[in-house]
Amino acid sequence: MFLAPDNAVKQLFRSLSPSWMAKLSLSYERTPIGTVLKKSLHEGPLRVQKALYPEGDDICHTVIIHPPAGIAGGDTLDIQVAVGKGSHVVLSTPSATKWYKSFKNPATQNVQFELGENAKLDWLPQENLFFKGANSNLITKLNLPASASFIGWDALMLGRHASGEEWSSGHIHLLNEIRRDGQLIWIENGHIDAEDPYSKSLPQLGSWPVCATLLALGPQCSNHLAENLSEMMPWTNSIRAGVTLMPQGIVIVRAVSIDIEMARNFMIDVWSKLRPIIHGVPAQPLRLWAS
């Protein structure tokens, strides 16, 4: 498939460049003046902008800056976030994370969240965009006590359909683990293989190029909440979604779509519905969503 010159050169440059390891460690605490970013340590091209407070001092917003050229084979992103007792943190990214073709080793993103008592976390990254030939590992691990609450999502876009590039080759490994007080309560280990017919079957993705998952945990998660959410689940030729409450008290919303913007807007709507219930604060759209 022919690529526009700029994109072709950029992808080739990143794919052939030496791989790198980037680390980011963030620690938040609740103080008398609100939630503060107490520690920010980084190695390599992965860092954060300054702490922002568009909702007031109680809620700390932080934007994680990914490498601007994207992620190629052999690269590793390691992100560790500790949200202290009583803190409320909103984490986001400014743009899509691009996963380029891997010629040898896979690229890996490893994200770990540790929440304290009564802590609250919104994990709202932009989508992951997988180029043809991408070989990627996405690992997310969460540990929280029963009193804490979490809302987070991940969206995957397979191929660059606007440029006419189908995701005809590549592999994605997804691993999600959730622990409550250190005890494993949920594990999801999935594989998406572009050349596997099952990956394009109805039980998996049904040939939809976009898929998204939202997870919510907290004392307010209930059957009643899941039933209310079910009323806003679309089922059209452009986007389809469903909601489930797991016995462990995890609300899971999954969606597939033909368009990433449509999926993103749907997830924002679900988050806006959940946030006042799960976190006890109004939903305020992030400014970067409008850019």
From Swiss-Prot:
Chief localization: cytoplasm
Keyword Repeat: no
Keywords carried by this UniProt record: Chaperone, Cytoplasm, Nickel insertion
Cellular component GO terms held in the UniProt record: cytoplasm
GO molecular function: nickel cation binding
Subcellular location: Cytoplasm
Free-text function comment from the UniProt entry: Required for maturation of urease via the functional incorporation of the urease nickel metallocenter.
Subunit relationships: UreD, UreF and UreG form a complex that acts as a GTP-hydrolysis-dependent molecular chaperone, activating the urease apoprotein by helping to assemble the nickel containing metallocenter of UreC. The UreE protein probably delivers the nickel.
Family statement: Belongs to the UreD family.
Record's protein name: Urease accessory protein UreD
Organism: Polynucleobacter asymbioticus (strain DSM 18221 / CIP 109841 / QLW-P1DMWA-1) (Polynucleobacter necessarius subsp. asymbioticus)
